[in-house]
């Protein structure tokens, strides 16, 4: 069995960055800690506002960041705003999670692109519904009630262009046998069970040599229920494992 590599090239100020989907046995472990602060409201009011994001999507994204400190950008959850749409994304180089939703709707907004350590969001914050982000502070909220805050530092550098990995369309016409890493599938399913009432996932793909996208509908703790015409879909991109001929 072989694990296919998805390699793409990103240029930024004449600096080229390669991001690989690599075998899982090569991953290294690392941890990041944050310091909790008091007087959340007073501190928050003095900070420059960056974003207000649904808590659950940040928590899910944090489950799929890299644990390899040598690839620090991939240890972060990336928030991107483009064409009035916010993308929350994370990848460890093996799989990619992303969720897209409208900017400036239902109080959710993003003023600039930013990458934040996934460790900030990994722990379950009881009753949290949204996260307020400033230049130096992340505040967990229950509607308009402040729950807790942590200081953080933004990751410097240009996050990989994930759009280059996502297929534009799907034929769903497969001519060759293929398999998936069961751990990667199971880890996404564990998150889907918390956010989807029917606990169902859908596979979409073209051929086993290109990425597949697994989707699930978000309808538990979904803050977008009142947003007409928007279908909240969790997306999980993963490469098949092919047998050698």
Each predicted region: which residue ranges?
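Short, positively charged and aromatic/hydrophobic N-terminal segments
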Residues: 13-14
């Amino acid at each position: 069995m072989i694990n296919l590599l998805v390699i793409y090239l990103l240029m930024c100020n004449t600096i080229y960055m390669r991001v690989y989907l690599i075998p899982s046995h090569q991953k290294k472990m690392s941890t990041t800690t944050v310091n909790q602060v008091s007087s959340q409201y007073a501190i928050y009011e003095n900070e420059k506002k960056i974003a207000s994001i649904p808590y659950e999507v940040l928590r899910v994204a944090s489950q799929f960041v890299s644990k390899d400190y040598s690839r620090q950008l991939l240890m972060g959850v990336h928030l991107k705003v483009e064409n009035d749409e916010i993308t929350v994304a994370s990848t460890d180089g093996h799989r990619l999670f992303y969720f897209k939703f409208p900017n400036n709707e239902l109080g959710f907004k993003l003023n600039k692109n930013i990458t934040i350590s996934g460790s900030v969001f990994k722990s379950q914050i009881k009753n949290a519904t949204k996260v307020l982000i400033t230049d130096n502070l992340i505040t967990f909220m229950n509607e308009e009630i402040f729950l807790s805050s942590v200081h953080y530092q933004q990751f410097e550098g240009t996050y990989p262009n994930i759009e280059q990995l996502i297929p534009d369309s799907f034929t769903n016409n497969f001519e060759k046998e293929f398999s998936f890493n069961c751990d990667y599938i199971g880890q996404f399913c564990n998150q889907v069970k918390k956010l989807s009432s029917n606990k169902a996932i859908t596979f979409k793909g073209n051929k086993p040599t290109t990425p597949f996208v697994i989707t699930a509908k978000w309808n538990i703790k979904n803050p977008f229920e009142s947003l007409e015409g928007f279908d909240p879909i969790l997306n999980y991109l993963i490469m098949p494992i092919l047998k050698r001929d």
